[in-house]
Amino acid sequence: MTPRHLLTAADLSRDDATAILDDADRFAQALVGRDIKKLPTLRGRTVVTMFYENSTRTRVSFEVAGKWMSADVINVSAAGSSVGKGESLRDTALTLRAAGADALIIRHPASGAAHLLAQWTGAHNDGPAVINAGDGTHEHPTQALLDALTIRQRLGGIEGRRIVIVGDILHSRVARSNVMLLDTLGAEVVLVAPPTLLPVGVTGWPATVSHDFDAELPAADAVLMLRVQAERMNGGFFPSVREYSVRYGLTERRQAMLPGHAVVLHPGPMVRGMEITSSVADSSQSAVLQQVSNGVQVRMAVLFHVLVGAQDAGKEGAA
């Protein structure tokens, strides 16, 4: 992992990823029983969130993570900043660097935006840490980390587990990051989607590809359902919403085909009735709300790793 950045799941070795997951658990434990959820870990640090796409879970969890670690958290959005007046992303980034930001957390519709931000602000390796909170259809590494943490908590481990990812793989930054991270952690990954929703070159990914959802269910340890990202489409990817749901939706019938220990995940937002029914989403096998809770502690661990370092995480978490 690049010490000052988290731009892609490929930045993470198995040791890096495991350390972040372990530290996420430590930070969560350190907060148990506190009337005021505050740790002094990042006191005096300034964290800036830069969200150029709509977000609820990711934006809020990064803000909460920073505040629970006593960082000063500042929000920048296109609507409420000079971006709305035409300022470029580069100029905004350089302005925030000059203002003394210690970390920049960016979500942007353009793939590669986080990498560019790191280049622009880190010319002399003394700029702010950059964390990718989702860039176009490219990647979303912290989502993959919180998914991995949830799987580990539910199943007791990730090594050797069979994880089935279903839906709009083509447009999903979550799928890309999860495939890389889960493979790094020793899981077997299966991608299930219609041919039209699979990216070119997917056969080169460390995953098996299937078009038959039912066939993959009996051996699945976890099923990660993905929303169809209609906002990134011009139509024509499948005949109808109803047909898509019939073939690739996680219904009660399909849930009954899963092993009893299997866990159901969804990165959100969910489109109930399309890729997942309400009864499945709200069932005991569903870990959707656990994912949200884990998002805060994972992002606490990521902020700590890029701003301070892993060596004192246990000591800081207990402070």
Swiss-Prot record:
Q: What is its EC number?
A: 2.1.3.2
Residues binding carbamoyl phosphate are 57-58, 107, 140, 143, 268-269
Which pathway features in its UniProt record?
Pyrimidine metabolism; UMP biosynthesis via de novo pathway; (S)-dihydroorotate from bicarbonate: step 2/3
User: Does this UniProt record's set of keywords contain Flavoprotein?
Assistant: no
What reaction does this catalyse?
carbamoyl phosphate + L-aspartate = N-carbamoyl-L-aspartate + phosphate + H(+)
- InterPro entries listed in its UniProt record: Asp/Orn_carbamoyltranf_P-bd (IPR006132), Asp/Orn_carbamoylTrfase (IPR006130), Asp/Orn_carbamoylTrfase_sf (IPR036901), Asp_carbamoyltransf (IPR002082), Asp_carbamoyltransf_Asp/Orn-bd (IPR006131)
- Keywords, in A-Z order: Pyrimidine biosynthesis, Transferase
User: Listed GO molecular functions?
Assistant: amino acid binding; aspartate carbamoyltransferase activity
Recorded hits in Pfam families, A to Z, give: OTCace, OTCace_N
**Can you cite a GO biological process for this protein?**
'de novo' pyrimidine nucleobase biosynthetic process
Q: Where does L-aspartate bind?
A: 85, 173, 227
Q: GO CC annotations?
A: cytosol; peptidoglycan-based cell wall; plasma membrane
Its subunit composition reads: Heterododecamer (2C3:3R2) of six catalytic PyrB chains organized as two trimers (C3), and six regulatory PyrI chains organized as three dimers (R2).
Among NCBIfam families, the record links this protein to:
asp_carb_tr, PRK00856.1
- Additional record remark: Was identified as a high-confidence drug target.
Please give the family membership noted in the entry.
Answer: Belongs to the aspartate/ornithine carbamoyltransferase superfamily. ATCase family.
Q: What does this protein do?
A: Catalyzes the condensation of carbamoyl phosphate and aspartate to form carbamoyl aspartate and inorganic phosphate, the committed step in the de novo pyrimidine nucleotide biosynthesis pathway.
Protein name according to UniProt: Aspartate carbamoyltransferase catalytic subunit
Which lineage is the organism of this entry classified under, starting from the top rank?
Bacteria, Bacillati, Actinomycetota, Actinomycetes, Mycobacteriales
